[in-house]
């Protein structure tokens, strides 16, 4: 038996293999002893097949089958036979056949696992992460990783067919603390100095364009030391792309083609020839987010003019201070319980809103609301007309400065859609969000900061305002959004390729010439040697595969992810290191009590 090599995968056997002699290897998913007859569900990467072990065919090896348990690793030599009509298992791809064992070899025993190795288990995620090598045996997790492999292969094939060259960029690079915090790596041979792990290959891919490579791509690991969410990891993977002698339309057309190719090849899904486009201003106005989920409606409605001048002092005071009033219309939800409404007040408070007003439209068209008494019949009629409200609808209002209204009402829109089942989980709603503001004002730092990246090119017509009014400058910046998740962009497709414009942008964000030279001098110098117009995009591979696999967290599509506290429960990383290692690096640790 030990001389026999595996010649088939478990999940590939079918009626066409009837009477075929096969050698299978895998893990025991389940064992059932029917007294003189043992059934084994044998699992490998391809799926599960039923193995039948009886003394007449297996001889002395029947005793081995009696001793095996779940997750034992075994090899089986046997013959495929058709199942009888009444024993066909429609839940298995191989359910029409079984393998009658002639020989059985135990390759390894196994302890009882801490959870069942099967799909749909209700197990604490930390336990799954601690025993990740067992969690990854589960078919759904293996499907996720195989989908990820298929996606990356399709990406590479597409890029190669469009004349792109895959080039690796450094992992140990220079710290340029603009944006998220860097992961720092101490240099042993340069005492007191540090490398940084790259947050993106941004600078290097621009230098490759200066170097004349023209079309670059890379599937690259990036690192950011930031607070984690369901769709964030300290180390993540992206498809990085850069092109020379292009404009934004060239980049968007090429990457739409890439995404169509990936979805068709990996999922068999045909996507539209052209994706929708909307400006950043429009996205914020209608959806309260620069990552709008377009699988449902419930757009934000500007109610400022409709309520202005009424007797409701709260709204009037906010409007007088430059604030706005917006609402969403939750169709058919006027019967919402008061307890749930009170909970929504707490929900919007998370996003900075100081309150939430509501109006329930009764069957007779009248308005039920604590604030209805502050509005005349004429005002109420105009409010209902502006909101396109009908009997049975619920209006939810937030009044504050525009940024708070957008954040609170945009989040409430998503929350109400989830609660009311308005989101079609099978729908794929792509859009480009274009024309981002170049800068946003940081109240904390009392200066403008780049909304995404200081290397983004401003629109040509806005360049003169870099020195006079940076807040009015828009960027040649574009994000691809799918179902409310940014999957491509980083909002920096078109880069600055002129030294004078780059200097003006650094000046606008408060970087002195000396600071800019210290951080980016090598790149600024390169711009003086004939940098071509260039631009690109980065696709978040983890997020993209998460959506394609219909998962809720990118941890489900990464083989060995970190927890939300950036730790690896399986390897116990990060960990303490020996004092000797620290001395070699010329550093010491000082723990600061919080």
Positions of PLM-derived features:
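Class II aminoacyl-tRNA synthetase catalytic cores and aaRS-like
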Residues: 1-594
């Amino acid at each position: 038996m030990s001389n026999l090599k595996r010649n088939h995968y478990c999940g590939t056997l079918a009626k066409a293999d009837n009477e075929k002699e096969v050698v299978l290897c895998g893990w025991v998913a389940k064992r059932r002893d029917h007294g003189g007859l043992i059934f084994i569900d044998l699992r490998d990467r391809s799926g599960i097949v039923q193995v039948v072990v009886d003394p007449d065919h297996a001889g002395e090896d029947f005793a081995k089958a009696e001793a095996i348990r779940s997750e034992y690793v075994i090899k089986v030599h046997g013959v495929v036979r058709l199942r009888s009509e009444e024993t066909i298992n429609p839940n298995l791809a191989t359910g029409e056949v079984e393998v009658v064992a002639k020989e059985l070899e135990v390759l390894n025993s196994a302890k009882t696992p801490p959870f069942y190795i099967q799909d749909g288990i209700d197990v604490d995620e930390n336990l799954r992460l601690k025993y990740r090598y067992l969690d990854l045996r589960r078919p759904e997790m293996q499907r996720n990783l195989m989908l990820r492999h298929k996606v990356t292969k399709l990406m590479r094939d597409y890029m190669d067919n469009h004349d792109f060259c895959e080039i690796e960029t450094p992992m140990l690079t220079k710290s340029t603390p603009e944006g998220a915090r860097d992961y720092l790596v101490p240099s042993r041979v340069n005492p007191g100095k540090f490398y940084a792990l790259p947050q993106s290959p941004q600078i290097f891919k621009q230098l490759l364009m200066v170097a004349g490579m023209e079309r670059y791509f890379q599937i690259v690991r990036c690192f950011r030391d930031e607070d984690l969410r369901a769709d964030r990891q300290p180390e993540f993977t992206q498809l990085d792309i850069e092109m020379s002698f292009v404009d934004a339309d060239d980049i968007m057309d090429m990457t739409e083609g890439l995404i169509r190719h990936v979805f068709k090849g990996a999922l068999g899904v045909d996507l539209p020839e052209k994706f929708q486009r909307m400006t950043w201003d429009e996205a914020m106005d209608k959806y309260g987010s620069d990552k709008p989920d377009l699988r449902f409606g419930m757009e934000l409605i500007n109610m400022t003019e409709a309520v202005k001048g009424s007797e409701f002092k709260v709204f009037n005071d906010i409007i007088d201070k430059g604030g706005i009033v917006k609402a969403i219309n939750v169709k058919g939800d006027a019967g919402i319980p008061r307890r749930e409404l009170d909970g929504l007040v707490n929900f919007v408070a998370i996003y900075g809103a100081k309150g939430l007003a509501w109006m329930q439209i009764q069957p007779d068209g009248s308005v039920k609301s604590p604030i209805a008494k502050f509005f005349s019949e004429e005002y109420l009629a105009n409010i209902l007309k502006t909101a396109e409200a009908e009997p049975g609808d619920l209006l939810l209002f937030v009044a504050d400065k525009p940024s708070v209204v957008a954040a609170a009402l945009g989040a409430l829109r998503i929350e109400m859609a989830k609660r009311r089942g308005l989101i079609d989980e099978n729908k794929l709603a792509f859009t480009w969000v274009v024309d981002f503001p170049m800068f946003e004002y940081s109240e904390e730092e009392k200066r403008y900061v780049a909304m995404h990246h200081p290397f983004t090119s401003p629109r040509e017509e806005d360049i003169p305002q870099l020195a006079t009014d940076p807040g009015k400058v828009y960027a040649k910046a574009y994000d691809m959004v799918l179902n409310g998740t940014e999957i491509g962009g980083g909002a920096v497709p078109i880069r600055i390729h002129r030294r004078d414009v780059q200097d003006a942008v650094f000046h606008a964000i408060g970087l002195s010439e000396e600071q800019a030279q210290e951080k980016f001098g090598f790149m600024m110098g390169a711009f003086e040697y004939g940098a071509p117009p260039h631009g690109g995009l980065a696709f978040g591979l983890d997020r993209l595969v998460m959506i394609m696999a219909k998962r809720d967290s990118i941890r489900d599509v990464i083989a060995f992810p970190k927890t939300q506290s950036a730790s690896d429960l399986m390897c116990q990383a990060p960990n303490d290191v020996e004092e000797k290692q620290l001395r070699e690096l010329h550093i010491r640790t000082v723990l600061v009590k919080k």
